[in-house]
Amino acid sequence: MVLQANTNKQSTFNLILYSKNLTKTMTPIQTNKMTNWRWVMCAMLFFATTVNYMDRQVLSLTWKDFISKDFHWTDDDYGTITAVFSIFYAFISLFAGKFIDWMGTKKGYIWAIVIWSLGACLHAACGWATFHLADTGWFGENVVKGTLMFTSISVYLFLACRIVLAMGEAGNFPAAIKVTAEYFPKKDRAYATSMFNAGSSVGALAAPLTIPILAAAMGWEVSFIIIGAIGFIWAAAWAFMYEHPHESNNVNEAELAYINSDEKQEEESTTSEDEGLQLTFGQCFTYRQTWAFIVGKALTDGVWWFFLFWAPAYFSELGYPSNTFTGQMLIFVLYLIVTVLSIYGGYLPKLFVENKGMNPYAGRMRAMLIFAFLPIFAMFAQPLAGVSVWLPCIIIGLAGAGHQAWSANLYSTIGDMFPKSAIATITGIGTMFGGLGSFLINKGSGKLFTYAEGQGDTFTFFGVTGKPAGYMIIFCYCAVAYLIAWTLMKMLVPKYKPIVE
């Protein structure tokens, strides 16, 4: 019995020892298999950007066919609203990046999306507030519906809501670019940026299929509330899911080593880490790299915002308003083209880096030159509208895809040349100048279209008369903006030159 007991104890001991050895043998396999939490973060950025653009699109899809009927808006009124949004977006962007760097990615992003979601929902109260202010004698006497004063009240209320929306939305891209720099090595950043930036196209793609239907079924006010409320859900998920990769339990050592592969490659040529170099706000403006990014944003952002804000109104002018099936399909197909093609925006420079041996910045600049040629087709949109409305739809889609591919690489140039501690700040500075460019195009477009419509056939441009001539002028600018921007960027920063001191 004693011998049998000792034998059993020995067997048990051997089994425990074998289990421990087996565990030790398995652990390296489990550890070395790289996790992919960085792509979960990229998916979160994609959804945030989708919500961002859907909130921005609600007004452009409801003003012409729903809101203007209540308040008698003109193109100039709408142009003023979009221009003020652009200018406040630009102004807040100047500080949003610094705010994200100071607050931190997690808290800063939550603040941004909560503010813009609140601003989106507040639009729903503008109708009630306009009628209430008009009826209660706030302006000395009851304001008659349909008068200039009544219209002005509604415009100012929408302006206030757009300002709140702009305050929050200005933080989206600085935060997203900072997350991309935290979670991806340089060679993957353009691709990751193109993936989350596709959210802007998907948001614009989903908007015409949902917003006009909601507005027609339940009122334009409800469309603002439902779309705006989605942002609060995202904020709750972000608070639960995001941690810096060094602190995240969902990132193992293998993935962390891959994320930090840039630092390992560069430690022989520099003794300071990216995260450690601190740039003051004023110092950022002393670098040519900053001004290259500024030029790239200022000359091209307005093109995308023009397509975003004015495409539904343009198709409505051609006889296909957003509350018709064809009008909705035109916007859907336009942004479907943008979404599908823009994804390759980050893949092309990756091919240049891996197959041609180019550094990331050189690969991006070559890809951006290729993408800069796509918007040239925009100058043919208006002349071909008389043949078929689907031709300008496809052409604007190609131009929009060129912009999104360009934009993904433009944002990634920041991570190529600036320390991580300054990425959100530089993004905010560039976004501010992009917003200024958007202000000029949107306000100028509204003024131009109203003037051209009033002049009728006496207003001509390249053989096109009246209001269509106004669109022709803007389309021509859209066609050449990217080639001009690329040329100036190349003059400012001819070769890859990271900022290390």
What is the role of each PLM region?
Residues C161-S200:
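Cytoplasmic helix-loop-helix junction between adjacent transmembrane helices
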Residues Q57, S86-L94, A204-L205, Y335-I343, ...:
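Residue-level signature of mid-helix packing/kink "hotspots" within the transmembrane helices
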Residues A237-Y242, A378-P383, Y471, C476-E501:
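Multi-pass alpha-helical transporter architecture, strongest
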Residues A362-N409:
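C-terminal transmembrane helical hairpin of 12-TM major facilitator-type secondary transporters
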Residues F91-F131:
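Conserved MFS/SLC helix-loop-helix module at the cytosolic interface between two early adjacent transmembrane helices
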Residues S201-H246:
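Helix-loop-helix hairpin linking two adjacent transmembrane segments in secondary transporters
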Residues L59-L61, Y287-S342, S407, Y411, ...:
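Extracytoplasmic gate region of multi-pass secondary transporters
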Residues V114-T151, L369-G386:
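C-terminal ends and interior cores of transmembrane alpha-helices
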